[in-house]
Amino acid sequence: VIRDHPDMILREKHFASIQINWNDKAQNLKQIADEINIGLSSIVFFDDDKLNQERIKQEFPEVLTIEIPNDPSQYSSILTNLNDFNVLQKTEEDTKRGEMYAQQRQRKQFENTVSNLDQFLKQLDIKVKIKKSNEFLIPRISQLTLKTNQFNLTTRRYQEEEIRKFSKDENFTVGCVQVLDKFGDNGVTGAYVVKKNGTSWILDTFLLSCRIIGRGVEDAMLSHILKDAKNNGIKEFKAEFIPTSKNKPAENFLSEFGFEKQDKFWVYNLNNNIKSPNHLMVEIE
């Protein structure tokens, strides 16, 4: 029907993920989340079947399940009145989100055609652009600190004015990363804040969108930050991991990179070699 019906307005290209089958709705929701690489808490479930509504509530309480009235004429007003889709300000990434999800589906399909992860990463032709904060990027950096939960070392939340203040302060470095590959532009998907305390720098904030985790971008980001510290004569670089109920994907990142635990901080000795991923290209702007 979607592909061939002459009166169908929506076509396959308008959907980020399509699950049309007889499978359980909960299973399909999980498949959608996996396919376009988003958290279940980012999904809204709108279904007129009360049994399906209850099933999703029990299986995935983090999914927003909408209570649907019996009268179909009220459906559009319910969606229109949902505050969950409202935002104070749209970033460039927001306007391209549907396109980005479609690209993510293509990446997933491509991944299934290659024999191993290393081959997949090399053939993606990943380019990482590391950018310093500026007035144009501040809204997106703030948005990432407010919304990113999974790969987020400290989960510190910063409003735009706070990011703007850090960006103008010589005792801070604020930056972000834009990630591109053969399928398209993922947009600005990572951010960091470094606090400079004399001869010791501290990684205040370090985060990456869950859509990009596992491609080596996090290693490229941290490698750049550490090299910057080393080039500025810093001998000791500190970082924190503050555990939450959602950031387990970032739990072992610092130790695996070579940091050692000292009291509440993780410390990297900048006399050591700093590793960098070799399957992607890094561009400093």
Would you name each region that the model predicts?
Residues 22-28, 51, 159-160:
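Short acidic loop-to-helix transition motifs that present clustered carboxylates
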Residues 17-21, 65-68, 130-132:
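Short acidic-hydrophobic, aromatic-tinged amphipathic segments that line or gate anion-handling sites
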Residues 38-40, 171-172, 231-234:
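Short, high-confidence coil segments that cap the C-terminus of an alpha-helix
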Residues 35, 57-124, 227-285:
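Terminal substrate-recognition subdomain of acyl/acetyltransferases
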Residues 129-211:
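A conserved beta-strand-loop-helix scaffold within acyl/acetyltransferase catalytic domains
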Residues 179-182, 188-263:
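Acyl-donor binding region in acyl/amide transferases
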Residues 29-50, 56:
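Conserved Lys-Pro-Asp/Glu-containing loop-to-beta segment of HAD-superfamily phosphomonoesterases
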Residues 1-20:
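Substrate-recognition/cap helix-loop segment adjacent to the acidic, metal-dependent catalytic center
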